[in-house]
Protein backbone atom coordinates (compact mmCIF):
# COMPACT_ATOMS: atom_id res chain seq x y z
CA UNK A 1 0.00 0.00 0.00
CA UNK A 2 1.39 3.37 -0.92
CA UNK A 3 1.94 6.10 1.67
CA UNK A 4 -0.79 8.50 0.43
CA UNK A 5 -3.40 5.75 0.58
CA UNK A 6 -2.30 4.70 4.07
CA UNK A 7 -2.32 8.32 5.29
CA UNK A 8 -5.78 9.10 3.87
CA UNK A 9 -7.18 5.86 5.29
CA UNK A 10 -5.75 6.62 8.74
CA UNK A 11 -7.03 10.21 8.81
CA UNK A 12 -10.48 9.20 7.57
CA UNK A 13 -10.78 6.42 10.15
CA UNK A 14 -10.27 8.99 12.91
CA UNK A 15 -13.65 10.54 12.10
CA UNK A 16 -15.31 7.50 13.66
CA UNK A 17 -13.63 8.23 16.99
CA UNK A 18 -14.55 11.92 16.91
CA UNK A 19 -18.30 11.51 16.62
CA UNK A 20 -20.38 14.41 17.90
CA UNK A 21 -22.10 14.17 21.28
CA UNK A 22 -25.50 13.88 19.63
CA UNK A 23 -24.46 10.90 17.46
CA UNK A 24 -27.15 8.26 17.54
CA UNK A 25 -25.28 5.17 16.42
CA UNK A 26 -22.33 3.69 14.60
CA UNK A 27 -22.03 0.45 12.70
CA UNK A 28 -19.95 -2.01 10.75
CA UNK A 29 -20.57 -3.22 7.20
CA UNK A 30 -19.26 -5.66 4.60
CA UNK A 31 -20.30 -6.72 1.15
CA UNK A 32 -19.48 -7.09 -2.52
CA UNK A 33 -19.36 -4.65 -5.41
CA UNK A 34 -19.33 -4.83 -9.20
CA UNK A 35 -17.04 -2.76 -11.43
CA UNK A 36 -14.66 -3.03 -9.72
CA UNK A 37 -15.45 -6.60 -8.62
CA UNK A 38 -14.49 -6.51 -4.96
CA UNK A 39 -15.25 -7.55 -1.42
CA UNK A 40 -15.28 -4.64 1.02
CA UNK A 41 -15.66 -3.81 4.69
CA UNK A 42 -16.10 -0.56 6.57
CA UNK A 43 -17.99 1.43 9.12
CA UNK A 44 -20.44 4.28 9.48
CA UNK A 45 -21.94 6.61 12.01
CA UNK A 46 -25.39 8.10 11.99
CA UNK A 47 -26.66 11.31 13.52
CA UNK A 48 -29.95 11.95 15.21
CA UNK A 49 -32.54 13.18 12.69
CA UNK A 50 -31.54 16.48 11.09
CA UNK A 51 -35.22 16.97 10.31
CA UNK A 52 -38.12 14.55 10.49
CA UNK A 53 -36.97 11.13 9.14
CA UNK A 54 -33.68 12.47 7.66
CA UNK A 55 -30.28 11.45 9.08
CA UNK A 56 -26.67 12.02 8.08
CA UNK A 57 -24.97 8.62 7.60
CA UNK A 58 -21.39 8.98 6.30
CA UNK A 59 -19.32 5.84 5.87
CA UNK A 60 -15.96 4.52 4.79
CA UNK A 61 -15.61 1.30 2.80
CA UNK A 62 -12.31 -0.38 1.88
CA UNK A 63 -12.50 -2.80 -1.06
CA UNK A 64 -10.05 -5.41 -2.32
CA UNK A 65 -10.04 -7.26 -5.63
CA UNK A 66 -9.91 -6.74 -9.39
CA UNK A 67 -6.21 -5.76 -9.00
CA UNK A 68 -7.13 -2.53 -7.19
CA UNK A 69 -7.69 -1.30 -3.64
CA UNK A 70 -10.55 1.17 -3.25
CA UNK A 71 -11.17 3.40 -0.25
CA UNK A 72 -14.61 5.01 -0.61
CA UNK A 73 -15.53 8.03 1.53
CA UNK A 74 -19.32 8.26 1.21
CA UNK A 75 -21.11 11.39 2.48
CA UNK A 76 -24.66 10.04 2.52
CA UNK A 77 -28.05 11.04 3.87
CA UNK A 78 -30.84 8.56 4.64
CA UNK A 79 -34.59 9.20 4.65
CA UNK A 80 -36.29 6.69 6.96
CA UNK A 81 -39.73 5.21 6.32
CA UNK A 82 -41.51 3.55 9.25
CA UNK A 83 -43.35 0.32 8.52
CA UNK A 84 -46.28 0.32 10.93
CA UNK A 85 -46.12 -2.39 13.60
CA UNK A 86 -43.04 -3.99 11.99
CA UNK A 87 -39.53 -4.44 13.42
CA UNK A 88 -37.98 -3.15 10.16
CA UNK A 89 -37.53 0.36 8.77
CA UNK A 90 -36.79 1.11 5.13
CA UNK A 91 -34.47 3.92 4.08
CA UNK A 92 -33.70 5.69 0.81
CA UNK A 93 -30.86 8.07 0.23
CA UNK A 94 -27.56 8.89 -1.30
CA UNK A 95 -24.82 11.43 -1.56
CA UNK A 96 -21.42 12.28 -2.99
CA UNK A 97 -18.37 10.05 -2.69
CA UNK A 98 -14.62 10.50 -2.84
CA UNK A 99 -13.11 7.27 -4.18
CA UNK A 100 -9.40 6.61 -3.77
CA UNK A 101 -8.29 3.93 -6.25
CA UNK A 102 -4.85 2.36 -5.70
CA UNK A 103 -3.37 -0.07 -8.24
CA UNK A 104 0.18 -1.18 -8.96
CA UNK A 105 0.64 1.59 -11.49
CA UNK A 106 -1.08 4.59 -9.87
CA UNK A 107 -3.17 6.13 -7.12
CA UNK A 108 -6.13 8.22 -8.23
CA UNK A 109 -8.83 10.16 -6.35
CA UNK A 110 -12.14 10.29 -8.24
CA UNK A 111 -15.52 11.79 -7.40
CA UNK A 112 -18.73 9.83 -7.52
CA UNK A 113 -22.32 9.75 -6.33
CA UNK A 114 -24.34 6.95 -4.72
CA UNK A 115 -28.05 6.19 -4.60
CA UNK A 116 -29.13 3.66 -1.97
CA UNK A 117 -32.06 1.73 -0.59
CA UNK A 118 -31.91 -0.37 2.54
CA UNK A 119 -33.78 -1.96 5.42
CA UNK A 120 -32.72 -2.06 9.05
CA UNK A 121 -34.12 -4.18 11.89
CA UNK A 122 -34.68 -2.46 15.23
CA UNK A 123 -32.08 -4.86 16.64
CA UNK A 124 -29.42 -3.34 14.34
CA UNK A 125 -29.05 -5.79 11.42
CA UNK A 126 -29.32 -4.07 8.03
CA UNK A 127 -29.05 -4.74 4.32
CA UNK A 128 -28.32 -2.13 1.68
CA UNK A 129 -28.16 -1.85 -2.10
CA UNK A 130 -26.27 1.03 -3.77
CA UNK A 131 -26.05 2.18 -7.36
CA UNK A 132 -22.93 4.21 -8.14
CA UNK A 133 -22.76 7.05 -10.61
CA UNK A 134 -19.79 8.83 -12.16
CA UNK A 135 -16.66 7.10 -10.72
CA UNK A 136 -18.24 5.06 -7.90
CA UNK A 137 -18.57 1.25 -8.17
CA UNK A 138 -21.57 0.35 -10.36
CA UNK A 139 -23.42 -1.59 -7.63
CA UNK A 140 -22.82 -2.59 -4.02
CA UNK A 141 -24.60 -5.19 -1.89
CA UNK A 142 -24.01 -4.59 1.82
CA UNK A 143 -24.94 -6.26 5.11
CA UNK A 144 -24.05 -4.84 8.48
CA UNK A 145 -24.93 -4.11 12.06
CA UNK A 146 -25.74 -0.72 13.62
CA UNK A 147 -24.90 -0.46 17.33
CA UNK A 148 -27.26 1.64 19.43
What are these regions (language model features)?
Residues 17-23:
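Sec/Tat signal peptide C-region and signal peptidase I cleavage site
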Residues 27, 40-44, 74-76, 91, ...:
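Membrane-embedded beta-strand positions in outer-membrane beta-barrel channels/transporters
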Residues 53, 109-111, 118-148:
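Predominantly the C-terminal beta-signal and adjacent terminal strand-loop region
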Amino acid sequence: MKRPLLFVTLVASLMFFATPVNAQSFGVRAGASANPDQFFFGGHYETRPLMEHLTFRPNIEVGFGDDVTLVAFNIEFAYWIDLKNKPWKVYLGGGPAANLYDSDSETDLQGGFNLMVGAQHRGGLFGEFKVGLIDSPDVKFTVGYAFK
